[in-house]
């Protein structure tokens, strides 16, 4: 991609080998490019096509975006849902919410503690904190965020989408 004379690398998560992680590429790319456009998607799956889900690969990408200096400002996140065999509105909602949840989870991590442990070679602390984070009450924070945004935290939105699908689509 090119913008204002700057060439940048577009990272399309859906076109990498499923065993390859793109999250480990972001820190390096952010050092050399003014911004990094990121196409967050999944390779084809039988159940949901390209719809972004709240899964490890997306959480890892979001964690790197949050942890990298200026990552939140320099990474441009885009998604698509045109291949979804499910309702397109539901695909958009599921994908957007999964991406937001992943970013929120990254923001809730004790980044300074992890960076200090990494820089001092204290890999025991880094591992212990990383494992402990997995049991943090993330769901309560997500529910509070949704409440603040006046949107349902659970699947209440699905009724509205199904009504729209039946009446409009």
What does each of the following model-derived ranges do?
Residues 2-11, 15-169:
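Histidine-acidic metal/acid-base catalytic patches
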């Amino acid at each position: 991609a090119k913008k204002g004379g700057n060439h940048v690398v577009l990272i399309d998560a859906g076109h990498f080998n499923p065993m390859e992680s793109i999250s480990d590429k972001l820190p390096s790319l952010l050092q050399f490019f003014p911004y990094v456009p990121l196409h967050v998607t999944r390779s084809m799956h039988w159940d949901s096509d390209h719809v972004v889900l709240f899964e490890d690969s997306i959480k890892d990408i979001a964690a790197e975006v949050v942890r990298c200096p200026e990552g939140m400002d320099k990474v441009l996140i885009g998604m698509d849902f045109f291949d979804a065999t499910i309702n397109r509105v539901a695909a958009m909602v599921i994908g957007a919410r999964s991406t937001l949840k992943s970013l929120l989870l990254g923001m809730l991590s004790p980044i300074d503690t992890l960076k200090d442990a990494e820089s001092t070679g204290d890999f025991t602390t880094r591992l212990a904190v990383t494992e402990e984070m997995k049991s943090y009450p993330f769901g309560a924070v997500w529910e509070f965020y949704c409440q603040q945004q006046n949107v349902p935290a659970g699947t209440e939105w699905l009724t509205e989408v199904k009504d729209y699908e039946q009446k409009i689509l």
